[in-house]
Amino acid sequence: MLAPIPEPKPGDLIEIFRPMYRHWAIYVGDGYVIHLAPPSEIAGAGAASIMSALTDKAIVKKELLCHVAGKDKYQVNNKHDEEYTPLPLSKIIQRAERLVGQEVLYRLTSENCEHFVNELRYGVPRSDQVRDAVKAVGIAGVGLAALGLVGVMLSRNKKQKQ
């Protein structure tokens, strides 16, 4: 049996499981979250994430968590609490609220929704999704290079036998 989803508390990071990526928001109380809304998030939950890669601006929005999540599952995920000390709750909420309505720079690789919420909670902008994607691309590149090398060696070996 699945454990119940813990009720978010103000300052908690909320991880929302979109079909192709994870969207992040920060819970500010009374059912509301503040999050970066690039075009893929403005269009509604589950919209194609490719739109996020094609823009350099996002709007900071305050919306009900149930509307932001839509039909997608979500969880409280303060995953860096052991590595970083969260900022005081009043500072987290104040900083988040002050940004609502502002248009901010958005870059999928360096200034995305995960960077945004980690900066609010810990004062450290970081995205594990980006780091993991870069690792995966690197590993795939090494794998492709190794396959290419094996192909060249097999081809040479076959020519030598002829």
Swiss-Prot record:
KW Magnesium (keyword) present: no
Coiled-coil regions listed in the entry: none
Residue ranges crossing the lipid bilayer per the database entry: 134-154
PROSITE patterns, per database record: LRAT
Keywords in alphabetical order: Cell membrane, Cytoplasm, Endoplasmic reticulum, Hydrolase, Lipid degradation, Lipid metabolism, Lysosome, Membrane, Mitochondrion, Nucleus, Peroxisome, Transferase, Transmembrane, Transmembrane helix
Domain LRAT: 13-129
Listed result of changing Q129A: Abolishes enzyme activity
pH dependence: Optimum pH is 8.0.
Compartment annotation: Cell membrane; Cytoplasm; Cytoplasm, Cytosol; Cytoplasm, Perinuclear region
UniProt note on tissues of expression: Ubiquitously expressed in normal tissues but down-regulated in primary carcinomas or in many cell lines derived from tumors. Highly expressed in white adipose tissue and in adipocytes. Expressed at lower levels in brown adipose tissue.
Segments in the Lumenal topological domain: 155-162
Enzyme Commission (EC) number: 2.3.1.-, 3.1.1.32, 3.1.1.4
Residue ranges, Cytoplasmic side: 1-133
GO biological process: ether lipid metabolic process; lens fiber cell differentiation; lipid catabolic process; membrane disassembly; N-acylphosphatidylethanolamine metabolic process; organelle disassembly; peroxisome organization; phospholipid biosynthetic process
Membrane topology (UniProt): Single-pass membrane protein
An annotated GO cellular component: cytosol
Domain remark from Swiss-Prot or TrEMBL: The C-terminal transmembrane domain is required for the targeting of the protein to damaged organelles.
Function: Exhibits both phospholipase A1/2 and acyltransferase activities. Shows phospholipase A1 (PLA1) and A2 (PLA2), catalyzing the calcium-independent release of fatty acids from the sn-1 or sn-2 position of glycerophospholipids. For most substrates, PLA1 activity is much higher than PLA2 activity. Shows O-acyltransferase activity, catalyzing the transfer of a fatty acyl group from glycerophospholipid to the hydroxyl group of lysophospholipid.
Similarity remark: Belongs to the H-rev107 family.
Protein known as: Phospholipase A and acyltransferase 3
Gene: Plaat3
